[in-house]
Amino acid sequence: MDKKYAAARLLPPIDASYQPARSVTKIPATSSLEEILEVLERDGGVILTDFVPKETMDKIDEELEPYTKTIPDSDSYDDFIGKKTLVIAGLISKSDTLANILDTNETIDKLLKIILEERYPAVFEGHTEELVIDPLLSISMAFHVGQGSPRQALHRDDMVFSSKHHPNMKINEVDGFSCFIAGSNVTRENGGTMVILGSHKWEHDRRGRPDEVSFLEMERGSAFIFLSTMAHGAGYNTIPGEIRKIMNLVFCRGTLRQEENQFLCNPRSKVLKMSPKMQTLLGFKKPAGTWLGMVDNDDPAKDLPAIYEKIMQ
């Protein structure tokens, strides 16, 4: 990365006197899909309270504990995260409990189908077929944000896909969405993510401004679902000795390249034990009727053990 951009990606905190005009909407995780979609359509993001029970969060903490010993001291993501934030990558292979949440959560499953599932007509000489391409898990990672970790420049996550935006984009036109799960209480003071409500419907070239942001504040176990078109950025943690913990599951369309190489970051022993649904999310299954992801002209998910055996020779 050109070093002239490094300083522009990590910034000082927003003045403490600034007060947002709006707060991020919170609704129970048990809310209907219609209620969740209504807020997503309007604001671009919504907090779902009590998304993960306390006992389950405790189990995730226990599973991730071995990976928290590394002292963050490198410029992760080309100076886009900062030296005082620990990043735990490949999260679903490090926490079976989190992987199970992804495998079994009906809300995430329904949102994936509505927002990111591709259904389109394929036109042949004498007929037309409807093809379906399943969404993918783009990346799974945890952030442990320490005191003094700077705020990120406001940005949109779908920039990694070279996505283009236009005013009033429909929810099923976006290229991705994220699910933040709070591993600790999240406040403005400990660096709660800055979000600009409504920015998911901006024109492509509009830049977010600090005087437009609201702050993500939620309790441990809550989740924040937001579209990849929403302008946001990590906040500045000002509290000595306090770590803000966020687990991030990012999803994308099945026609896009995943941000994290799921084929290499998930151990074979883990993948072979996963459900067909999880293998599909990672990209190991060829979408029915299409030709994406073939191995030897066939669907690798038909016999993954044999495929692994062959490539390990």
Curated annotation (Swiss-Prot):
Gene3D superfamilies: q2cbj1_9rhob like domain. This is Dioxygenase swnH2. Its cofactor is Fe cation. GO terms for molecular function: dioxygenase activity; metal ion binding. Aminotransferase; part of the gene cluster that mediates the biosynthesis of swainsonine (SW), a cytotoxic fungal alkaloid and a potential cancer therapy drug. Swainsonine production occurs via a multibranched pathway and is dispensable for fungal colonization of plants and infection of insect hosts. The first step of swainsonine biosynthesis is the production of the precursor pipecolic acid (PA) via conversion of L-lysine (Lys) to 1-piperideine-6-carboxylate (P6C) by the aminotransferase swnA, the latter being further reduced to PA by the reductase swnR. It comes from Arthroderma benhamiae (strain ATCC MYA-4681 / CBS 112371). Pathway: Mycotoxin biosynthesis. Fe cation binds at residues 155, 157, 232. Transmembrane segments: none annotated. The keyword rRNA processing does not apply. The keyword Transport does not apply. Homodimer. Coiled coil: none annotated. Belongs to the PhyH family. The gene is swnH2. Pfam families: PhyH.
